[in-house]
């Protein structure tokens, strides 16, 4: 049957039939619940915020326990993702909870690439899940799903506006993860400032095109409460695991000299709203949105890069072998193109090197001829000086000989005069 025939058959009016007795498929919801409880659930939270903003404290407060923590330094060279997985149980429900902390986020002087490590981590989890899906022998039932289901983005309570880092980071993350912005340490600013700050944050998010997670309103069971809670975003929260006595009750709160801030008092902060929306009402929707929206977007992009694509209903679908052959031809063509480019680059490099060598040879030849000419000139000067010196030596020798001759003659003349005088006396 062709694809168009199947589509035409599926669009035909379906008939409703009455059952003459009990069949038993009304137990399907119970079967699904039983299977899910047996298998357990996983939930992965990414906490993005500056060091010391209260991420660990809020996680402890949300799940009413104490997770192991590690003191983080303000002098990290870069952003480091630190995942921790815990096994939790409430009644007969098992939850594998993973909390991923962004150590060193926003602590560097140059914050341009602070978001990159976070984006890479999310993509890595998507890629790991995709590789598991593409295996011939898949084991998704036992596979630990590490994809991030929600990003709690902690905003510093400045009371003015969002930092540039926050806007850039959330813009890079909104297509990859469900973002719930929260104002941390909300007890550090007044209620009037907090109200204005919330309005300013939402205005900046909308004007910059940042898509945060909206609590779903298509389910009648939760549509009303989710619609109301969407208007309270971002949640202003306070976290604390310490118990303070207020009246006759012990409540989780923060004790100050001027009073007590109760964590679960909705007139003090939005912690209860966050817990209701994150855990008690929309946890499954966050898991579903991660799979059907964010992961599907990543999966589609990756498969398109690999050469897979959807076909029109009227066209014959490509088989895996056809897709492989098309991709192989494309790869070989690209490889040949690269080889030709490299060959041409090598030829150009050789020509350039030969030209440089010839130029260098010419320069050396000119320098050699210049040195040779200088040598000849210097040799000529030395030869001229040698001849002049020889002439001077010859002239000196001649004068010396003449001088010696004169001296000899003078000596002989002087020695003959006394002899003559003696002869004259004798005569």
Swiss-Prot record:
The keyword Nucleotide-binding applies. One of its GO terms (biological process) is protein localization. PROSITE patterns: G_SEPTIN. InterPro entries: G_SEPTIN_dom, P-loop_NTPase, Septin. GO terms for cellular component: cell division site; microtubule cytoskeleton; septin complex; septin ring. Residues 406-427 are annotated as: Disordered. GO terms for molecular function: GTP binding; GTPase activity; molecular adaptor activity. GTP binds at residues 49-56, 104, 185-193, 239, 254. Residues 49-56 are annotated as: G1 motif. The keyword Nucleotide-binding applies. Keywords: Coiled coil, GTP-binding, Nucleotide-binding. Residues 101-104 are annotated as: G3 motif. Residues 184-187 are annotated as: G4 motif. Residues 406-418 have a biased composition (Polar residues). Residues 320-407 form a coiled coil. Residues 39-305 form the Septin-type G domain. Belongs to the TRAFAC class TrmE-Era-EngA-EngB-Septin-like GTPase superfamily. Septin GTPase family. This is Septin-8-B. The gene is sept8-b.
